[in-house]
Each structure stands twice: as C-alpha cells, then as structure tokens.
Amino acid sequence: MAWLRNPWGRPRFLPLVTALYIFWSVVPVVIAILFAFNDSRSRTSWEGFSMRWFYGDETLSVWHDPALQGALKHTLLLAVLCVAISVPLGVTLALGLQRWRGRGSGSINVLMLLPLVTPEIVMGVALLLLFLQIFNQIGLGTTAQTIGQITFTLSYVVVMVRGRLVSIGPEYEEAAADLGAPPHDVLFRVLLPLLSPAILASAAVVFALSIDDFVVTQYLAGDADTTTVSMLLYASARGAPTPALNALATIALFITLGTLTLVYFVYRRFAGGEDATAVAALEV
C-alpha cells in the first residue's frame, strides 16, 4: 500500500531483488572457477587446491591438450580480427551517419540498429545460407566466422561512437576549422582524440562479445580448427567433462576481465584529460 501511495518512491524490496539477481548470476560462475582449481576430477566434491587442470596434468590440462589450446587460440584470433575490423569501420560509419542529413538517412540508421534486435539464431541461419548458396567461394571457417561476428558487433561501435559525437557537439570541429585547420587535422588531432573514450569502450565491448558469441560462430564453423571456447564447452558439457574445461573457461574469463579492466583505466585517463587534449589540439 505504501508503494501505491507513492509510486515514484523506491520500492523497499528493490535492493533485495537486485541482491538475489546478482547472487543468482555470480554464484554459478564462482563455482565454475573454483572447481577449475580442484585437485580431483570430481565436479561436486572439493579435494584440495591444485593447478592440475591448467598445466599439471600431462594429458588433460589446458597446457597439454591440443584441442583446448586450439579452441583458446582460435577464440582470441577471432576476437582480435573482429576488433581490428569492426572498430575502424564502425567509427567511419558513425562519422558519416552523424553528418548525413539527406534522403534515406533515417532508413540507414534503422538498418544499422537491426543487428542489435535481430535474434542471433536468425542471423546465424541467414549468414549460413548466404555463405553456402551465394558466397560459397568463401566457405565456412575463420573468414566466415569473422564476417559473421563483425555483422552484429559493428552496430555496437556505431551506436557508442555516435553517442559520443552527440555529447561533444560540433563546437570543437567548428573552432578548429575557424582557426584554419585543414580537414585531416580536424579529424586526427581534434575529433579522434575526443572520441577515444568511446572508441576504447566499443573495442572492449566488441572483444567481449566476440569471445562470448556461440550461435553465429557455431553456424559458420568449418573444421575442428575453427572451434572456439564456447563451442567446445557446449559440445563437452553433455558428455563427461573434466575440470580442464573449467580451467579453459576461467582463462577466457580472466582474459576478458583483464581487457575490460585495462580499457577502463585507459578510458579514465583519456576522459579525465579530454578537455585539455582538445584545447591543446586547437592551440596547435
């Protein structure tokens, strides 16, 4: 009844619901990480701390199992390729769309947002048919997986960079142009430094999405050499998985968290000095 009397107030049960959600989301991950360091093959009973499944076991550990190593390397390869292509292309598209005011600009903006709302299974099937029937000379494998991941990660870069463009406004560009700076100097010495926080953040998001992706990557996979960590975990989960899979997932998780942490500190550094950067660029 108190909530009905004041519907705009914060419900008292909201902190409890939030805590339960966080607990439900985090606990399974913590348990999976914990059993990656279990000395036994058991996934239910703890028998002591060990690095056996990372490098100690000479046949089943991540360090000694070629299949686990190959999945991790291929996952990181796809993530690096996706970031290297999606981020520059997304920044270019964001700059172009932000300045395009002609006919059809609204339709293009809607098309750029479609990958964000399209179910992954629909996108995966569509891309599979595309590579099998139209671009069959490319075939399935690393190239198809990279193109597939770029297809849905590109929109994230465009949205984040355009948001940054809207927030900084056109004033810095106009001031640089008024001071006689040529267009390439305005772009590389004024605009891109101001966009660097959004570019870094979008790169981190694309990296995490690439490592996490399963559906599109699974549909576009070729032979065993194009297996990723998520695909390997899914294929092994229904069998008799060893804690080495927990170790593999833990490594992938810490790589992602380490990347996000690094980007966060770099972002703080850029964001903290963005005004000084812009002023210095204008003075030059």
Language-model regions, residue ranges each:
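Transmembrane alpha-helices
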Residues: L16-V29, I150, V158-V161, I168-P170, ...
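C-terminal transmembrane helix and the adjacent membrane-cytosol boundary/short C-terminal tail
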Residues: A2, P7-W8, F13-L16, G104, ...
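Hydrophobic positions within alpha-helical transmembrane segments of bacterial inner-membrane proteins
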Residues: V29, A79, V83-V91, L95, ...
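Interhelical loop and adjacent transmembrane-helix boundary motif
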Residues: L4-R10, R41, G48, W53-P66, ...
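Transmembrane-helix boundary motif in ABC transporter permease subunits
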Residues: M1-P7, V80-M112, V125, L129-Q133, ...
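Membrane-helix interface segments
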Residues: R12, R99-I108, Q137-T142, P183, ...
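Membrane-interfacial helix termini and adjacent extracytoplasmic/periplasmic loops
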Residues: W3-L4, S42, M51, G104, ...
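A structural signal for multi-pass alpha-helical bundles of membrane permease subunits
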Residues: V26-R41, H74, G124-N136, A204-S210, ...
